[in-house]
Amino acid sequence: MQDLKASLIKVFGERHLVEAFGELTLIVDSQDIIKTCLKLRDFFYFDTLIDLCGVDYLTYGQSDWNGNASASGFSRGRNHQGSKDRHEQRFVVVYHLLSVSKNKRIRVKSFVDEAEPIIKSVTDIWASADWYEREAFDLMGILFENHTDLRRILTDYGFKGHPLRKDFPMIGEVEMRYDEDLGRVVYEKVSIEPNINVPRVIRK
């Protein structure tokens, strides 16, 4: 991995590369995503996109987060975070790439504007990005410019909003399901109470 890290630093610069927990993460400006991904594919042989998702940092570092917890076992230390630990930018698109021939992996992160979360599609670089980008659009509301079929992929017909956003309302919405007794589709009000079963941990 150190050889890959050194090569990436030569091309992209050290300040854009983060190494943590045995993984490399490349931070990329959204305007440079196509140029960067082409370099990763053509010069570093990352020929496979294995995952793409959106992340919402809206409540990152607020209540219910632990800042000091064991990385293994059952120990959980509690140290509530303050505003200094919150992300300056809200939405990020995360790409996980694999080089089959070199047996290397890398994560690419690109933050997008909160008011207009738009980034260019990478479907022309990796065809596997197609449904991943549709999922990120559906659940997070991130728009992928030049995607040829950017439709919802998981939510129901007529669904309003993007359900994985941290500010998505938990009450007042409706869901659709098939009622076997009535023999038709029905709409019911949704009321979901936030329930944290697994401690949220900020690892640095």
UniProtKB/Swiss-Prot annotation:
Keyword Transport listed: yes
Uppermost EC category: translocase
Superkingdom of the source species: Bacteria
Catalytic function, reaction form: a quinone + NADH + 5 H(+)(in) = a quinol + NAD(+) + 4 H(+)(out)
Enzyme Commission code: 7.1.1.-
Protein purpose: NDH-1 shuttles electrons from NADH, via FMN and iron-sulfur (Fe-S) centers, to quinones in the respiratory chain. The immediate electron acceptor for the enzyme in this species is believed to be ubiquinone. Couples the redox reaction to proton translocation (for every two electrons transferred, four hydrogen ions are translocated across the cytoplasmic membrane), and thus conserves the redox energy in a proton gradient.
Gene Ontology CC annotation, any one: plasma membrane
GO molecular function: NADH dehydrogenase (ubiquinone) activity; NADH:ubiquinone reductase (non-electrogenic) activity; quinone binding
Pfam families: Complex1_30kDa
Keywords: Cell inner membrane, Cell membrane, Membrane, NAD, Quinone, Translocase, Transport, Ubiquinone
Family the entry assigns: Belongs to the complex I 30 kDa subunit family.
Organism: Ruthia magnifica subsp. Calyptogena magnifica
InterPro entries in alphabetical order: NADH_DH_suC (IPR010218), NADH_quin_OxRdtase_su_C/D-like (IPR037232), NADH_UbQ_OxRdtase_30kDa_su (IPR001268), NADH_UbQ_OxRdtase_CS (IPR020396)
Protein name, per record: NADH-quinone oxidoreductase subunit C
Subunit structure: NDH-1 is composed of 14 different subunits. Subunits NuoB, C, D, E, F, and G constitute the peripheral sector of the complex.
Main localization of the protein described in the UniProt heading: membrane
Compartment(s) where it occurs, according to its Swiss-Prot or TrEMBL record: Cell inner membrane
Topology of this chain in the membrane: Peripheral membrane protein
